[in-house]
Amino acid sequence: MQLNSTEISDLIKQRIESFNVVSEARNEGTIVSVSDGIIRIHGLADVMQGEMIELPGGRYALALNLERDSVGAVVMGPYADLKEGMKVTGTGRILEVPVGPELLGRVVNTLGEPIDGKGPIEAKLTSPVEVIAPGVIDRQSVDQPVQTGYKSVDSMIPIGRGQRELIIGDRQTGKTAMAIDAIINQKNSGIFSIYVAIGQKASTIANVVRKLEEHGALKNTIVVVASASESAALQYLAPYAGCAMGEYFRDRGEDALIVYDDLSKQAVAYRQISLLLKRPPGREAFPGDVFYLHSRLLERAARVNAEYVERFTNGEVKGKTGSLTALPIIETQAGDVSAFVPTNVISITDGQIFLQTELFNAGVRPAVDPGISVSRVGGSAQTKIIKKLSGGIRTALAAYRELAAFAQFSSDLDEATKRQLNHGQKVTELMKQKQYAPMSVFDQALTIFAAERGYLSDIELSKVLDFEAALLSYARGQYAELAAEIDKTGAYNDEIEAQLKKLTDDFKATQTW
């Protein structure tokens, strides 16, 4: 068989044309140094701030410092086996976490991976952890309540859907207990909850999850965990990951509540990362952008209007507003609310609930200090009946605190002052509440009605809580229809007032407490 030169050249051309050349361009760099969870990378030319960098073994680092000839990145996870000279790759992606209803009832880590042993999570969507907050035009004013189930909070410091209300106090003053009770109270309210645990002991978090499960609230809750044993990077990112999960509900016309427990530990984790990245320290060694750290997180909690929801869902959801309510927690040192991080978060949020060690130790639990606790926007969101009845509660407590200080130095008090002191003591006693026992709107309204209309004046101080328990039990038995109506509508009119008066008079006549 003979081949001439033309056939040979045609054959070669065919082979060349059919040859499949596959080339892959990868943005690759080399690790120059590894120390304390921070890696320096040389050669990553095209990398974004906050980009995920793929490391050997399927782990990732987060690019935070972009310098002229190197990139400073923080490793998300263990770093002991990383060595100088290893190759790393830029992914071109910002960190994303899984979001959606599939996460409800689950315990996940910062990256959205399940850690509760209940199998994988089949989430259909992911969302970037860093998202720009809704603009002014997309927002709507707060006018719907979030019932915490606490008499002292719902009457004096009401919280609305889309509000940011800070819970602040020293260690062991009941901050987490208050937030967990607020989550438990949402189990039948249609509000989804996200609990973000930052830098806490694993045993404490396990206890919280168990309590949520016991009270039937875990099925509507996502628990995001960055425990004390996790790296600083994961503790710093956990609130943003939890917020992205909450925004899924907000942007689809649902209501969600997120608890950050606590942002002091997140600020400490961020300070650690910043100092290791050699960023210049400022006040209390925090970096210059620690205010922005919290403001960009808390601004994402908002009430968005129906147009925003409709636009976001491409017209699938119409006529529904969405909200994300935030309860950030800050731990103070020896009651110092004027420290750097507490003052920052106080100025960002729409009010604060201040829990005091002295009150807690005196048995007033929840230990809410009504003097410096405020809610800047919750008043317009308060349930109508609670708003009408609770007007005098804060005044009575403030007057009582002031008079109690003078009463220590004086024995001969006039009748009016004695009456005021007596009333203040009774109201203080009445504001006490057990943990894991959130109260309905009707129960709160009836209790406050009894206090405000003078029904407690002849009750001994030690019997006030017994009187309240017996009154509520009697009301639920004899006036079930009234209770159901108030729980459903929260309305208040002359007819309801007359019924509440008759109920309390009838009960007092029984003398059974």
From Swiss-Prot:
Tree of life domain: Bacteria
Keywords assigned by UniProt, alphabetized: ATP synthesis, ATP-binding, Cell inner membrane, Cell membrane, CF(1), Hydrogen ion transport, Ion transport, Membrane, Nucleotide-binding, Translocase, Transport
GO terms for cellular component: plasma membrane; proton-transporting ATP synthase complex
This protein's record includes keyword Membrane: yes
EC number: 7.1.2.2
PROSITE patterns noted in UniProt: ATPASE_ALPHA_BETA
Localisation per UniProt entry: Cell inner membrane
Site (Required for activity): 373
GO molecular function, one term: proton-transporting ATP synthase activity, rotational mechanism
Membrane topology according to the record: Peripheral membrane protein
UniProt xrefs under Pfam families: ATP-synt_ab, ATP-synt_ab_C, ATP-synt_ab_N
Family classification: Belongs to the ATPase alpha/beta chains family.
Function: Produces ATP from ADP in the presence of a proton gradient across the membrane. The alpha chain is a regulatory subunit.
Subunit structure, interactors included: F-type ATPases have 2 components, CF(1) - the catalytic core - and CF(0) - the membrane proton channel. CF(1) has five subunits: alpha(3), beta(3), gamma(1), delta(1), epsilon(1). CF(0) has three main subunits: a(1), b(2) and c(9-12). The alpha and beta chains form an alternating ring which encloses part of the gamma chain. CF(1) is attached to CF(0) by a central stalk formed by the gamma and epsilon chains, while a peripheral stalk is formed by the delta and b chains.
Protein known as: ATP synthase subunit alpha
Organism this protein belongs to: Vibrio vulnificus (strain CMCP6)
Taxonomic lineage from the root: Bacteria, Pseudomonadati, Pseudomonadota, Gammaproteobacteria, Vibrionales
